[in-house]
Amino acid sequence: MASSPKAPKSHRKFQSIYHPTRPLSLWQDNQHDQGEVRIEIIPLIDVVFCILTFFILGAVGLSRQQAISLDLPRASTGAPQMREMFMVSLDDLGQLYVEKQPVSQEQMVSALQNYHQYNPSGLIVLHASRNASYNDVVQLLDTLRTVGGDRVALATLPGDGQTPSGMNPNSFNNPNLGLPGMTPGNAFPNGANPGMSNFNNSNPGGSGAGVPNFSNTPLPGMPDANGNVSPNPGMNPGFPGGGAMSPDPNSQSPNLPGMGNTVPSAPQQ
């Protein structure tokens, strides 16, 4: 087979310079050819929730009521107040504070009047320390009530409010509380009454222990209703109804008045 004739060098150089280029094929997404723009919702939701959380925390922190650090007493019967409140604090030394700022009583009254003017239904709360003087607390409450009326409350710490197991607070006022060997209306076990025979058990409800009735029992040495005097041995004979005492003749004690004639002891040599 005969070979093709070779082109001259000049022609080959011209062909290499002006060789036509082939078009490049680029990959294109045919779905976006229509010109639609899609917004990603999930990243937008994340950003919105982050901003919302920031604003919630900022609003709660800025709107919180500020007060002095006090040792408040506890109360299990207190009810939480959710209304708008005006805080007044009283420390151990009797110093007044309004919004953590020390004020005098006149300044506090002026602040209360301004608050009551713009918030007629607002609640005035007193934060009094546990060690504050009782007189200071009462006087301050009286001052607050002159401005706020019945919208004044004491701030306390919440208590557990639980009654100990096995304890019934009404049992202390129960007259029929049963004790071993005891019955209502009798103060001694099993109805025994040592040394006393007449008890006043006429209380039908048995609300208290039996009380001895001495209305018909005369006192020793004193006349009774019939004029009789009960004997009183061993007492001073100068007393009505008293018996005579027999002193010991060998006693070294001096004569006592009202003891009768006693024989003095012979002086010792």
From Swiss-Prot:
Q: Which residues lie on this side of the membrane: Periplasmic?
A: 62-269
Q: Where is this region: Disordered?
A: 190-269
Alphabetical UniProt keywords: Cell inner membrane, Cell membrane, Membrane, Protein transport, Transmembrane, Transmembrane helix, Transport
Task: Give a yes or no for keyword Cell membrane in this entry.
Answer: yes
Q: Which residues cross the membrane?
A: 41-61
Give the membrane topology.
Single-pass type II membrane protein
Q: Where is the composition biased (Low complexity)?
A: 193-204
Q: Which GO terms fall under molecular function for this chain's record?
A: transmembrane transporter activity
What is a single Pfam family found in this protein's UniProt entry? ExbD
InterPro entries under this entry? ExbD
Kindly list the GO CC terms recorded for this protein: plasma membrane
Family to which the UniProt record says this protein belongs: Belongs to the ExbD/TolR family.
Q: What is this protein called?
A: Putative biopolymer transport protein ExbD
